[in-house]
From Swiss-Prot:
The keyword Metal-binding applies. The gene is pyrG. Belongs to the CTP synthase family. It catalyses: UTP + L-glutamine + ATP + H2O = CTP + L-glutamate + ADP + phosphate + 2 H(+); L-glutamine + H2O = L-glutamate + NH4(+); UTP + NH4(+) + ATP = CTP + ADP + phosphate + 2 H(+). Homotetramer. It is an enzyme of class 6 (ligase). This is CTP synthase. The active site is at residues 391, 523, 525. Coiled coil: none annotated. Mg(2+) binds at residues 76, 150. It comes from Nocardioides sp. (strain ATCC BAA-499 / JS614).
Length: 569
């Protein structure tokens, strides 16, 4: 794109109800524009007063997505990264808490020269600065062609008003020809009358107009396709072109949404409206992904043993990484959500895990459900079930091994009991002040991208195909180095450490002991992409498929498969 052409800004708003899929709609549009050869980046404006979601309850907010530079962000940032296949930074997520904190700090410094600080212009100017900052140049010096900004919340909510006003002012500042407003709304189907109702969408657009924004296009979320008559009515009553009324009916997979929007002509309309270079969409990569999604050759069941399974969004990136691991093998991954409490006893673990092909133990905080995670890991280790542990999953893997193999019956973590007699997991030295209450909890963990050196001959080294890797982290606790020798002598392999060997990053069992039993202190799910599955998850699914193929072989007393005797054929 010509460098003289200004960056275009696309704002995505939502109406009628929350959880309509604004983030997925925005991500899919970004994917389409990127497939047309445009440089696209994305941003989320969140109207809550928290500075970031780092200390929020997973049951309320879902997962916390960590960027390379260590920002704790909204889970929609994960959608953006997966659909665009790019890495975003902390400026991709703006919250009301960040905006107000910055404005108040400036006021205290005297930056406003005695002005009365108000929502308009001071808060809105701060928001505008953060929106426009996304349109800078990339590492290669080229400017971004399109910035897609999702405005969180629902039009009409008081919390979103400053963000909507800032977006309106951005349109005024950069020119209408460089700005596009996309409104996502609900068109409900009323069963008894057999009708699709447009009134909620009309009222939602009316509320948007009240704050000075006229949408350029409307994406209608529904459980079925909209007939032309309904589209024509929405076009007339909402004052948008009929070509800009887009149906986005429920799809079999979230990865179908770009095709749905393209079929409806949304990307072509936007490109014409913003006078962007018109190139055909290159479907090469996405078509291959959809083939793997819809036409798998294998199917495996993976148990996700977690504390927050009542809200699957708490493990959104883990679930998507597991599914992507299946795509690598043209396999469908069926997730079984297992509450860790249900695996606290041997009988409970067997009941929930005896027929799964693999197990994933994800991260979390606090003592609740820990004994269940340990029970699940004991079952996985002794029955040869391929297992992947993430963050807390690594710590539980070490505790379980210390108790049941090494003989440290009181092994534990200082997170759960500061006075545990055998702290095989301990607080990181630089984290002790925060844990003891001497500092803020928010934003103070070991966050962001950190390197690890992998041991030759290990599973980790094999699946990564490299001896030095980088992964994103979010933790305060680590394997206690005082117990490393004792654990290694008992057969546990510390297959990856920080380059200076001070922090354990990967733990596993040798392949001759277990087919695939590995964990990492990092969060590799955050770097997985549907088109580039993460090697740890692909390795887990590969091991699960291999185990399926060997199910006809008996299991010996160690829980491992053995070759059948000649008379067993």
């Amino acid at each position: 794109m010509n460098q003289a052409t200004p960056t275009k800004h696309v704002f995505v708003t939502g109406g009628v109800a929350s959880s309509l899929g604004k983030g997925l709609t925005a991500s899919s549009l970004g994917s389409l524009l990127r497939s047309r050869g445009l440089r696209v980046t994305m941003q989320k404006l969140d109207p809550y007063l928290n500075v970031d979601p780092g200390t929020m309850n997973p049951f309320q907010h879902g997962e916390v997505f960590v960027t390379n530079d260590g920002a704790e962000t909204d889970l929609d940032i994960g959608h953006y990264e997966r659909f665009l296949d790019t890495d975003l930074s902390q400026i991709a997520n703006v919250t009301t808490g960040q905006v107000y904190s910055s404005v108040i700090a400036k006021e205290r410094r005297g930056d406003y020269l005695g002005d009365t600080v108000q929502v308009i212009p001071h808060i809105t100017n701060e928001i505008k600065e953060r929106i426009l900052a996304m349109g800078g140049t990339g590492e290669d010096g080229r400017s971004v062609d399109v910035v897609i900004t999702e405005v969180g919340g629902t039009v009409g909510d008081i919390e979103s008003l400053p963000f909507l006003e800032a977006a309106r002012q951005v349109r005024h500042d950069i020119g209408r020809e460089n700005c596009f407003f996309l409104h996502v709304s609900l068109v409900p189907y009323i069963g008894p009358s057999g009708e699709l109702k447009t009134k909620p969408t009309q009222h939602s657009v009316a509320a948007l107009r009240q704050v000075g924004i006229q949408p350029d296009a409307v994406v209608c979320r529904a459980d079925r396709e909209l007939p032309p008559s309904i589209k024509k009515k929405i076009s007339l009553m909402c004052d948008v072109d009929q070509d800009a009324v887009v149906t986005c009916a429920d799809a079999p997979s979230i990865y179908d949404i770009p095709k749905v929007l393209h079929r409806e002509g949304l990307d072509a309309y936007l490109v014409r409206r913003l006078d962007l270079p018109f190139r055909d969409v290159d479907w090469t990569v996405w078509d291959d992904l959809l083939r793997r999604v819809h036409h798998p050759k294998e199917e495996v069941t993976v148990a996700l043993v977690g504390k927050y399974v009542d809200l699957p969004d708490a493990y959104l990136s883990v679930a998507e990484a597991l599914r992507a691991g299946g795509f690598a093998h043209e396999a469908k991954v069926q997730l079984r959500w297992v509450a860790s409490d249900e695996c606290q006893t041997a009988a409970g673990a067997a009941r929930n895990l005896q027929d799964v092909d693999a197990i994933c133990v994800p991260g979390g905080f606090g003592v609740r459900g820990i004994e269940g995670k340990l029970g699940a890991l004991t079952y996985a280790r002794t029955h040869g079930i391929p297992t992947l542990g993430l963050c807390l999953g690594l710590q539980c893997m070490v505790i379980e091994y210390a108790r049941n193999v090494v003989g440290l019956e009181k092994a534990g973590s200082t997170e759960f009991d500061p006075d545990t007699p055998e702290p095989v997991i301990a607080t990181m030295a630089e984290q002790k002040a925060f844990v003891e209450g001497a500092g803020d909890l928010g934003g103070t963990m070991r966050l962001g991208l950190y390197p690890a050196a992998l041991k030759d001959g290990s599973i980790a080294r094999e699946v990564y195909g490299s001896s030095l890797i980088e992964e994103r982290h979010r933790h305060r606790y680590e394997v206690n180095n005082a117990y490393r020798d004792q654990l290694e002598e008992a057969g546990l392999v510390f297959s990856g450490t920080s380059p200076d060997n001070s922090l354990v990053e990967y733990v596993e069992l040798p392949r001759d002991t277990h087919p695939y039993y590995i964990s990492t202190q990092a969060h590799p799910e955050l770097r997985s992409r549907p088109t580039r599955p993460h090697p740890l998850f692909a390795g887990l699914v590969g091991a699960a498929i291999e185990r399926q193929r060997e199910l006809r072989f008996p299991i010996d007393e160690t829980g491992l498969r053995r070759e059948p005797e000649p008379d067993e054929d």
